[in-house]
Amino acid sequence: MSKPNHPRTLADSEAEAVLRNLRCSPRKLNVVAASIRNKPAGKAVADLTFSKRRIAKDVKKALESAIANAENNHQLDVDRLVVTTADVGRSIVMRRFHARGRGRAARVEKWFSHLRIVVAERDIETKADRRARRAAAKPAASASPAANEGVPA
């Protein structure tokens, strides 16, 4: 018996694309997926375009599909999209054998993967915004006299 399937429901500001049975091991695909997580969609597409990994082309297609779904099906602003999740899952493993010497055989496993990309509409924070936010939080922490008590002069 398998456990019941409860797909994650998407929010109104999210769109997804799913690729099934990609001919790449989940371990290798996860390296590429991790490189685009939490990035603005435009930057993620640019990174995948110039990636040297073979599977990056398929990941880019899935990301472009998610962006198109967001624009056409959910009427989201393309310039404000961020890759919120890029999930990699195991698919089938095709097993073959490789003939070896003295009548022996070695097992060859060809791994397949599933990929699910979710993009969401958010305000994209620039470096200047991030610096300003961190600068505003920093003086409050260092201004307290208790922080400097144990420091010899």
From Swiss-Prot:
HAMAP family documented for this protein: Ribosomal_uL22_B
CDD domains from the UniProt entry: Ribosomal_L22
Pfam families membership: Ribosomal_L22
Tree of life domain: Bacteria
GO molecular function terms noted in the UniProt entry: rRNA binding; structural constituent of ribosome
Biased composition (Low complexity): 137-147
Gene: rplV
Keyword RNA-binding carried by entry: yes
GO terms of biological process kind: translation
Role: This protein binds specifically to 23S rRNA; its binding is stimulated by other ribosomal proteins, e.g. L4, L17, and L20. It is important during the early stages of 50S assembly. It makes multiple contacts with different domains of the 23S rRNA in the assembled 50S subunit and ribosome. The globular domain of the protein is located near the polypeptide exit tunnel on the outside of the subunit, while an extended beta-hairpin is found that lines the wall of the exit tunnel in the center of the 70S ribosome.
Region annotation (Disordered) ranges: 128-153
Assembly behavior: Part of the 50S ribosomal subunit.
Family in the record: Belongs to the universal ribosomal protein uL22 family.
Keywords for this protein: Ribonucleoprotein, Ribosomal protein, RNA-binding, rRNA-binding
Organism: Acidiphilium cryptum (strain JF-5)
GO cellular component: cytosolic large ribosomal subunit
Protein's UniProt name: Large ribosomal subunit protein uL22
